[in-house]
From Swiss-Prot:
The lineage of its organism: Bacteria, Pseudomonadati, Pseudomonadota, Gammaproteobacteria, Enterobacterales. GO terms for molecular function: anthranilate phosphoribosyltransferase activity; anthranilate synthase activity; magnesium ion binding. Pfam families: GATase (PF00117), Glycos_trans_3N (PF02885), Glycos_transf_3 (PF00591). The active site is at 84 (nucleophile), 170 (for gatase activity), 172 (for gatase activity). It comes from Escherichia coli (strain K12). This is Bifunctional protein TrpGD.
Amino acid sequence: MADILLLDNIDSFTYNLADQLRSNGHNVVIYRNHIPAQTLIERLATMSNPVLMLSPGPGVPSEAGCMPELLTRLRGKLPIIGICLGHQAIVEAYGGYVGQAGEILHGKASSIEHDGQAMFAGLTNPLPVARYHSLVGSNIPAGLTINAHFNGMVMAVRHDADRVCGFQFHPESILTTQGARLLEQTLAWAQQKLEPANTLQPILEKLYQAQTLSQQESHQLFSAVVRGELKPEQLAAALVSMKIRGEHPNEIAGAATALLENAAPFPRPDYLFADIVGTGGDGSNSINISTASAFVAAACGLKVAKHGNRSVSSKSGSSDLLAAFGINLDMNADKSRQALDELGVCFLFAPKYHTGFRHAMPVRQQLKTRTLFNVLGPLINPAHPPLALIGVYSPELVLPIAETLRVLGYQRAAVVHSGGMDEVSLHAPTIVAELHDGEIKSYQLTAEDFGLTPYHQEQLAGGTPEENRDILTRLLQGKGDAAHEAAVAANVAMLMRLHGHEDLQANAQTVLEVLRSGSAYDRVTALAARG
């Protein structure tokens, strides 16, 4: 018998569902979604075998009261079952996309195909079910198993380790012929507790034997890492094993999706936007070119949600510089989204969104060597941008990171390295791996391709956050050094290409005109004024 807290998303089906569950002997309490999430979490803590069930409902998941917050705070901590709107909320919470299904269904019987596993074990296949929906989940992340579908549309998902699952259809409906049995098998599956040590040991053994993990195995491993379920010695051994063999794109993608799924949510816009970011660790100690480029790109009409952190290896990371400008690193997600909408730029401070990183920090500090975590930063932007310009500290990483971006489903992106720097530069050829609609093209760019004068790397040397702030203030006000102007122009020109403006030379000239107008600095002061 389960103790079920049924979240009512203001839908009459909630009570049909409650009647079905109670008829099978389960305890059910119902709360509407306008109740604060904290109140419901405290109520769940008083229940002996708690299961959170998310009801159907109108609208979209983000507008369903406390449901998104409950998913963020509780997944992996107790079983969660979502139905229709609840299923869509689960898809979004794990990094998937919810959009129009192409038709509006109200009480239509469809025969779905399922995998015959877990809650679907022993059920008729195809299984007649009742569908009431106009939205559907897609771009399902690696951590979720798609266990039922209809004509290519996702009808059910599950996360085995977290004991979270969702049904797009209505199991409580009379049109779902084996719905009562499905609900009982789902509750039985949900209440089976997996021991992390037991489920992770085969994955660790593969690493010790220098074998490559699948994306799902890597996802499972790093989900345990960010939840603090791995012992320090296990994490150290796993990271070193992967480093010695060389990290595979599927392993990087699995780790990235695990961190994204466990990140604090950001209200993702439906318009085109990008990130421009570097891994750091190139040892160049240059001015913060990508951060300056984000403001200039916004002044050029692009939208940039830049993800960043404080510096580890240089004097000034992106967040160090922003703090020196008086920009609030702890700005909440809604205010950051508003800045992106209105100013064209926002900054998402990594520790605010990825609190699970703290479990790995002691091991990373003890190892004192680069590991997979060093390349994850640019890949775990909680806004899930469809476009990205990513610089890497080593030319050997250019193609693997591009392949990882393909696995992660980016629409268009470029991974670059140039003469020891993790960005487009003009002192040496820039190595590029560009992803566009699933295809990766490798090429090189020089200063001539941008119509710009080459400069020496030493001319881009930076200093402390305060020194870089002063340098970039002059640059963004249109009074900057020519080498600094050219560096930013090249990077923003490349970002413009990812938005469909293919002519790099024309792009660079546009950027220089905007830079010299001083309008980019207005974005800095406006963002700082938002507090």
